[in-house]
């Protein structure tokens, strides 16, 4: 019913800001007066599409703390019994919060300047099978790709689960491919790039791997940003030795997939999720330079979001999703 929908919207606003499930003491020292000032407000309620928006006071959050913000705005909502399903379609960040995050070190303009390519696509291949080649075989393939199309092909990329394996150690692969990159660049006079996967659950290991890439002459690193986590992305942006960051979204579907028919349509959803639009925006704020955002009509479900994701990654001011 409409009344129940209104109750749910209000409960989501309360739970994601200063509300709680029980009556609390409101006397001296209780914090209730400030909590009342900081409470969120649900607005633009649309029962026909089961959508609503929530507005938060900026002072409710630490400006440069993405993990803290997400613990608030989407932290507990999905677990509420009164909700049958929920999807966070978008998060609109205020200017002062956007400016508090590092953002991409290079971005589109910086990457084009780095590569000496003002217009047109940057072309690279992700070798298949995902794993199976040795480090030397990976380097041999890189040579083929770096010289393809009369030298107009730019790069090669590790896949998400190619890390440091018994038959393909990270340092061996990094060194071998980047030696080929250097050789081809010197011969052709054209810049190439290798997206070398530093993914690890230990931050120190990822930073060490980034250091190896820099030492061997690389310009890029790749990391599985969902699997490693928001704090890992933020830290790698701040502490990596001047490398551009490519973000692979492996594991995202456990956050973003929705099996209902109503995403961006009739509001009928079955699951609890966050859109890839929101995830992409978060990753851009945290500092990735390029993002594996998916493509329309490809093997991964995109719910028609591909253009929205592109806008989030390219535009200075992103359009509001409906």
Regions found by a protein language model. Give the residues of each.
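Glycine-rich, proline-tolerant flexible connector loops at the mouths of alpha/beta enzymes
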Residues: 153-175, 295-300
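A cross-domain feature marking catalytic cores of carbohydrate-active enzymes
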Residues: 127-129, 160, 196-200, 223-225, ...
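N-terminal active-site wall of soluble small-molecule enzyme domains
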Residues: 173, 177, 185-194, 198-214, ...
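Acidic (Asp/Glu)-rich catalytic clusters
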Residues: 112-117, 146-150, 171-189, 211-215, ...
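Active-site mouth loops of central-metabolism enzymes
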Residues: 1-3, 119-140, 193-205, 253-275, ...
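Well-ordered, non-membrane alpha-helical segments in soluble/globular domains
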Residues: 5-10, 66-69, 138-142, 170-178, ...
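Catalytic alpha/beta core domains of metabolic enzymes, predominantly
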Residues: 207-210, 216-322
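N-terminal capping/small domains of soluble enzymes
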Residues: 1-152
